[in-house]
């Protein structure tokens, strides 16, 4: 990908057991290894609280493992390298992994991996504030699932990458 065409959105959809957590963690880690402060500009959305917790734990533990050269993180390190420029040294990867880990742990509220429900709730709360509707706005989760299931289910069998480019 050239510097003129930077991906603003990457969307992965896949069935259970297909490696979504691994894939998302690798991509997230690659982004923050490239630029450690970018964690503040990344949003990962999952369907369940369990998936959210697993994703956060995986990213933090792999940043630690990569940064400290732990053998159990070698599969992540090799995949992360695929998304980094060739001139990115192993030492730079280690240093930036630890730097990103430190940034995230010291600014955890900006480590944005959340469920689709909490994402929509936050968006609606912001919209309500902008429209001066007060804080009584609530998201009805059953309705949200009825809305999102028909959208996401038909393409839930393969990983799809969608790119929106800056001209």
Regions found by a protein language model. Name each.
Residues 46, 111-113, 118-167:
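DNA-processing P-loop NTPase/helicase core
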């Amino acid at each position: 990908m050239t510097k003129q065409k930077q991906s603003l959105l990457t969307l992965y959809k896949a069935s259970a057991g297909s490696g979504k957590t691994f894939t998302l963690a690798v991509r997230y880690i690659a982004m923050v290894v490239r630029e450690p402060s970018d964690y503040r500009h990344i949003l990962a959305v999952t369907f369940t609280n369990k998936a959210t917790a697993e994703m956060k734990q995986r990213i933090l533990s792999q940043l630690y493992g990569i940064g400290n050269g732990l053998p159990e993180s070698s599969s992540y390190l090799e995949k992360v390298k695929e998304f980094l420029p060739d001139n990115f040294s192993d030492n730079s990867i280690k240093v930036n992994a630890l730097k990103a880990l430190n940034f995230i742990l010291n600014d955890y509220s900006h480590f944005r991996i959340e469920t689709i429900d909490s994402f929509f709730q936050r968006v609606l709360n912001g919209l309500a504030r902008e429209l001066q509707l007060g804080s009584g706005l609530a998201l009805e989760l059953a309705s949200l699932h009825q809305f999102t299931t028909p959208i996401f289910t038909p393409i839930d069998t393969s990983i799809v990458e969608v790119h929106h480019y800056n001209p």
